[in-house]
């Protein structure tokens, strides 16, 4: 289930980028409220299989973000993303530990990856940041139980503090 948020003209240009920031429940809940975001979907980036069944295959929990680049650009989306992650933590966000909880920015568009590299390069702490930036080679939608999890079950665990989680949510 993709969540539709942005009510722009149907002719608006759409682009897609993928963010991995630990447990995908919180990442989806935060990003879906950003202005310019059309839709979000919980998924898995860059694993080796095309299924959610079976053993761990190297994927990163991620959120597919469909957005209107005339309303919010990639650099701005990355800035928002950095509000909810610890960019220095390798394979760990909050209490979630393991390679699937690594931080990453993925895309099929090289311009998105170049923007992400530039975003980090221009930070004073660039040498400490462990966010991976890679082409999206494989994406698998997460099972329905993970879609919109914190919307449906707002008291479930989330590594992102509530005051930040809903910072951009309209009343």
Language-model segment annotations:
Residues 1-171:
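Flexible coil/turn and secondary-structure edge motifs
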